């Protein structure tokens, strides 16, 4: 029972927020309906949807909406214990065995990391359904702030098999997008979410 509760700890609120954020934005709702209809057909019933689930789950827009909800609505506490003495993080040194506790909340809202749109119209504090999409021939799209120097180089422009649709990526925000924690203690349920 406890395992099933933990399994739903993120997915249920994120589905709820995804629905709310989609329903209050008529243009986004129309886009989502179009994406679902293009995959499952306009007359698909709830019982028929299972056969279309792999394509729905890999749809770039739906993935971006879910990832954006995790970014903006979810904060994870990460605990670590250094196994070496004088373990350094930034300007701080920690002795071996002391617990380090941090939150993903700030990192997932860091303006120096995240793309806020070409005219800064999509604040890191607000939901933006397309934040995780990279459009063909648009070097300013994608989750990472354009021009930001990072050792994790994301795609400059993404293309799907046909070459005309956006792709979903988290490449340019590796290390800052950590909705499931990380390391050996990363959430084992992340593959089910």
Regions found by a protein language model. Give the residues of each.
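Cytochrome P450 heme-iron axial ligand motif
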Residues: 7, 166, 172-193
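Generic, well-ordered alpha-helical scaffold segments in large soluble proteins
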Residues: 18-25, 35-39, 65-68, 72, ...
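Catalytic or ion-translocation cores adjacent to nucleophile or general acid/base/metal-coordination motifs
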Residues: 28-43, 54
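Conserved cytochrome P450 K-helix/beta-meander segment immediately N-terminal to the heme-binding cysteine loop
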Residues: 102-167, 192
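Central I-helix of cytochrome P450 enzymes
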Residues: 1-35, 189
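Conserved cytochrome P450 K-helix E-x-x-R motif and the immediately C-terminal K′/meander segment
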Residues: 42-91, 101-112, 167-168
